[in-house]
Amino acid sequence: MIVTTTPNIDGRKIQNYYGIVTGEAIMGANVVRDIFAGITDIIGGRSGAYEEKLQDARQIALKEMEQNAARMGANAVVGVDIDYEVVGQSGSMLMVSASGTAVTVV
């Protein structure tokens, strides 16, 4: 599955458009609370544990989006956008969402 932020793929022609596909991942209250409380390992102003959790959530969201595209018959997703949003009561959760357009390229 080809996944790209661009609206097209160089050297490939979009044959079919299937519509918008999405994927989401939500990090629970304990992870977000720990991250913002500074309990994680901060090295040089960056939190390695936080970055790892964000990477995990991003990969889950992208994988879910790809699976949804494959179910539609697509072999690529173009125009991908990844968003991060704090949700829940008092910002207790972090949601990572990925969205794009499912297409078939040849």
UniProtKB/Swiss-Prot annotation:
Matches recorded under SUPFAM superfamilies: YbjQ-like
Superkingdom field: Bacteria
Gene3D superfamilies with a match to the protein in the record: Hypothetical protein apc22750. Chain B
Family, similarity comment: Belongs to the UPF0145 family.
Record-linked NCBIfam families: PRK02877.1 (NF002776)
The name this protein goes by in its record: UPF0145 protein DSY2697
